[in-house]
Amino acid sequence: MIGNLSGIVDEVRSDHIILNVNDVGYMVYLSAKTLSACAIGSRIKLLIETYANNRENTTQLYGFISEEEQQCLRLLVKVSGVSYKTAMSILSKLTPEQLFLAIMNEDKVTLKMSGLGLKLINRIITELSGKVSKLEINNNNFHPINEDALSALINLGYEKMKAYDTIKKYRPNLDTKDIIRMALKELSTL
């Protein structure tokens, strides 16, 4: 079993890289977000998840920059009907924080994407809602927020994740009116 790989990026493709580790090139599949951080010639260290694809008689490597993203993949593939490829496409669209919030809030709109039907989205929410709340999450990645400010922005028509990403920058103990005012100002410039 491979825990991590550290090497130089030789090639960047649409869904994977070739990582040169001591003159051996490993094909490592990445989420779109991780892939966008890779440049040919750059040195990178990835956490690795190994998948033995028995149907195609191959072993595939999936790479992650953060433990949270790796945890998400491990949780997602335990859900019946979620393949590694599907899990990676989810992680390409959502950060671990956004995924956890969508599951905890049963936010089907955020989870809706190509390749995920309503039944599978419901199964993901049902099977993972209890597990997500018990996860050990790096406190640097999850921020307490002013729920009233979030609710106000959503009621004004802003997308839930965009509103959350905006107001998490402000201290939750600020006055709700001030948070809403600052968030509206920021959202109007986007």
Swiss-Prot record:
It is found in: Cytoplasm. The keyword Electron transport does not apply. Residues 144-147 are annotated as: Flexible linker. Residues 66-143 are annotated as: Domain II. One of its GO terms (molecular function) is ATP binding. Keywords: Cytoplasm, DNA damage, DNA recombination, DNA repair, DNA-binding. GO terms for biological process: DNA recombination; DNA repair. Residues 147-190 are annotated as: Domain III. Homotetramer. Forms an RuvA(8)-RuvB(12)-Holliday junction (HJ) complex. HJ DNA is sandwiched between 2 RuvA tetramers; dsDNA enters through RuvA and exits via RuvB. An RuvB hexamer assembles on each DNA strand where it exits the tetramer. Each RuvB hexamer is contacted by two RuvA subunits (via domain III) on 2 adjacent RuvB subunits; this complex drives branch migration. In the full resolvosome a probable DNA-RuvA(4)-RuvB(12)-RuvC(2) complex forms which resolves the HJ. The RuvA-RuvB-RuvC complex processes Holliday junction (HJ) DNA during genetic recombination and DNA repair, while the RuvA-RuvB complex plays an important role in the rescue of blocked DNA replication forks via replication fork reversal (RFR). RuvA specifically binds to HJ cruciform DNA, conferring on it an open structure. The RuvB hexamer acts as an ATP-dependent pump, pulling dsDNA into and through the RuvAB complex. HJ branch migration allows RuvC to scan DNA until it finds its consensus sequence, where it cleaves and resolves the cruciform DNA. Belongs to the RuvA family. Has three domains with a flexible linker between the domains II and III and assumes an 'L' shape. Domain III is highly mobile and contacts RuvB. This is Holliday junction branch migration complex subunit RuvA. It comes from Wolbachia sp. subsp. Drosophila simulans (strain wRi). The lineage of its organism: Bacteria, Pseudomonadati, Pseudomonadota, Alphaproteobacteria, Rickettsiales.
